[in-house]
Amino acid sequence: MKRPFISRERLKQITETYPTPFHLYDEAGIRQTARALHQAFSWNPGFKEYFAIKATPNPAILKILKEEGCGVDCASYVELLIAQKLGFTGQEIMFSSNNTPVEEMVFARQLGATINLDAYEDVAFLQSVATLPEVISCRYNPGGVFELGTDIMDHPEEAKFGMTKEQLIQAFTELKDLGVKRFGIHALLASNTVSNDYYPELAKQLFQLAVEVVEKTGVTLDFVNLSGGVGVNYKPEDKPNDIAVIGEGVRQAYEDILVPAGLDQVKIYTELGRFMLAPHGLLVTHVTHKKQTYRTYLGVDASAVNLLRPAMYGAYHHITNLDRPDGETEIVDIVGSLCENNDKFAKNREFPVSEIGDLLVIHDTGAHGYSMGYQYNAKLRSAEILLEESGQTRLIRRSEKPEDYFATLYGFDFEK
C-alpha cells in the first residue's frame, strides 16, 4: 500500500485554496532523496548528479536541487536557458542532446556546458558550428539487448541514441588530435529499472569500455556518466531501489576494474530524474462523475493532459481515495474527460467504492508528470504547488487561463 506524503486533512485544506486538479511536490522528500544519493556515492570525490530537467522543469524544484549540490542535464535550448537563469554555470550543466539544432549546440558552448555527443558525425558538426571544448563526452550504444541475469531489460540496438564502440574510439582519437584535453563516457541502456543491479552492471560495462578506450587512444578519461535509468516502484508490491546498495555496487565495480588500470581519479556522474522526483509528487483530483455501462467508470477532473504516462505507455500509477481508503471495493476504470478512449488512469482496477466529490491522489507523478502535459481538446494545464519543509504551501506555477491558450495566435482577438 502506498501512503501519500501528506495527510487527508492537510490536503483538504489545500484544495480549499487551490482547485483540483494540481500537482503537489514534497520539498522534504526531495531533499532527503538528494542527500541519500550523495551519501551513496560519497566514496567518489568527484561525484556529481545532473538532474534531468526534462523530468520536472520547474525553477522552484531546480533551486532546491541546486542547494543540494546537483547540476542539471539539459537537452534543449529552453532547458539550457532555464539553467542559465537559475545560475547554473559551466560544468554544472550537462548537455545531452540528439539531432541537435545549430543554435542549441552554439548556446551550450557559450554557457560552457559539458557537451555529450550523441553521434560520431557530431564531431564534424560541432567543429562546423562552434569551437571545441577542453572536456567532451561521447554517448555509447552497445547494441544487442541489455540483460540483468535472465531478464531482458531493454533493446539498445533499437535505440536512436549513441554510437558504437568503434565510432566512440574513432571520435576520441579525432577529438584528442584536435586538442580536446579530457573525455567522458556516457550510456543509458534501460529506463525505470526497479533493480539494485542496474547501475552496477552498467558500471561494469562502461568501466571495461573505459579501460579499453584509454589503452587504444591514450586519452585522459575524466568521468563516466551512468546517466539515468534507476526507477521507482510505481506498483506498491514492488520493492523500491536502495540507493545505498546501488552506490556500493558501483564502488565495487570501480575498485575491481578502474583502480587496477590506474584510473582511480575518474569521476562518477549520474543524470537521475525519475528517481529524484517521482515519489515526491502527487496529482490531486476529485471524482466528478460515476457511470455504469459495460464497465464502471469513475470520472475525475484530471486527464491525460495532466498525466500522460498511462495513456501513452499504459504505465501504472497507484491511486488512493483519501476519503474512502478502506472498505468495500469494485472494479473500475478511472478516466478523464478527453475525447480519446486512452484517457484512462486505471483500467479494470480494484478500487474502493467511490462517490462523486471524493478526493483522490495519483502517486509518483513528481517526474514526467506536468512536464509531459499538453493541450488537446483545448484543455489547460494545471497548477504546481510546493509543500515546503515548514508545512506551508507555495504556488510555483499557476494554472493556465484561456488567454494563455490564445496568446500565441494571430488573427484572433480573444477580447472580443
Predicted regions and their residues:
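A charged N-terminal "starter" segment
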Residues: 1-115, 120-134, 177, 181, ...
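Active-site loop/helix belt of alpha/beta enzymes
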Residues: 142-288, 351
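Charged (often Lys/Glu-rich) extended helix/loop segments that serve as interaction or gating elements
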Residues: 258, 263-416
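Structured core elements
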Residues: 71, 94, 114-116, 137-139, ...
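Conserved, mostly hydrophobic/aromatic
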Residues: 30, 54, 76, 108, ...
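Generic secondary-structure signature for well-ordered alpha-helical cores
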Residues: 35, 39-43, 128-131, 173-181, ...
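Glycine-rich, aromatic-flanked loop segments that form ligand/cofactor-binding clefts
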Residues: 131-145
